[in-house]
A protein has these predicted regions:
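Glycine-centered hinge/linker elements that transmit conformational signals in sensory
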Residues: 25-57
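Alpha-to-beta junction loops
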Residues: 70-78, 92
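Extracytoplasmic/periplasmic substrate-recognition and gating elements
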Residues: 49, 88-151
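Pocket-flanking alpha-helical
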Residues: 6, 65-66, 82-89, 220-223
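Beta->alpha turn/N-cap motifs
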Residues: 61, 77-83, 99-100, 116-118
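Short helix-initiation/N-cap motifs at beta->coil->alpha
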Residues: 55-69
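Extracytoplasmic/periplasmic solute-binding protein
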Residues: 1-29, 73
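Conserved C-terminal helix/tail region of periplasmic/extracytoplasmic solute-binding proteins
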Residues: 175-228
Length: 228
């Protein structure tokens, strides 16, 4: 919850939007402070207080993964970068799936993570343009994508010929349980504010009595580009 990449999946899951329906209009404010957003906030307050829930930021992921080895953890939200450690901990029990559904008050939805991609670019002012373009085309081809996935876990755009439990789950996640990460400059107001809000929930500073005020202040700062 204290990771600003993960926490929006709950708000987006019940229909919340950031900067327009497709995240491309910075003039349209984030609307997570409405009735649905309040229901999600109250849901997260209860989730953080649940003894079966563990909140580990990326730098502490190893602590949570170790719980798999001890048989004390049923599921973990992460990415391809943690596959080796999790698969080592679970052995034959290793599996992956798209994000789950949940119910926050009167609202039901499916968690929706940010989806994004990377590209291989060429400097338009480089001296050897033909060579640079040829290299970029080569690095972007299906064979190189497959190698990067097998060696580094970088998810390929072209997964032809790859049958893998994690890649299949990632494909399902992108297709069924994701929204495009907004790239507008107004997103600068999101990251630190979302992290602070998540940490406040985990610390118990956001509770059912002050949830609306805290949520309103959080989103106001997001839309203003300020900080809590």
């Amino acid at each position: 919850l204290s990771n600003s990449w993960y926490i929006p999946s709950f708000f987006c899951g019940v229909g919340g939007t950031m900067f327009g329906p497709d995240g491309t209009d910075g003039s349209v404010p984030c609307d997570f402070d409405d009735e649905k957003g309040l229901a999600v906030t109250n849901y997260l307050i209860d989730l953080a207080a649940n003894p079966k829930f563990t909140n580990q930021a990326n730098e502490e992921a190893g602590k949570a993964i170790n719980l798999f080895t001890e048989g004390k953890l049923g599921a973990f939200f992460s990415g391809s970068w943690d596959r080796e450690a999790i698969e080592t901990a679970l052995g034959d029990n290793f599996a992956c799936a798209q994000l789950p559904s949940f119910k926050a008050g009167d609202y039901e939805g499916t968690m929706k993570s940010y989806a994004g991609s990377k590209a291989i670019g060429v400097n338009p002012t480089c001296e050897n343009m033909d060579v640079a373009v040829a290299l970029a085309v080569y690095l972007g081809n299906a064979d190189c994508q497959k190698i990067r996935y097998e060696v580094r876990g970088v998810v390929p755009l072209d997964s032809t010929g790859i049958d893998d439990v994690m890649l299949n789950a990632i494909t399902d996640t992108v297709n069924n349980t994701s929204v495009a990460q907004p790239l507008v400059s107004e997103m600068n107001g999101w990251w630190s504010n979302a992290e602070a809000f998540g940490k406040a929930i985990v610390a118990g500073e956001v509770n059912h009595d002050n949830a609306q005020d805290k949520l309103t202040n959080f989103i106001a700062n997001v839309n203003a580009g300020g900080s809590l």
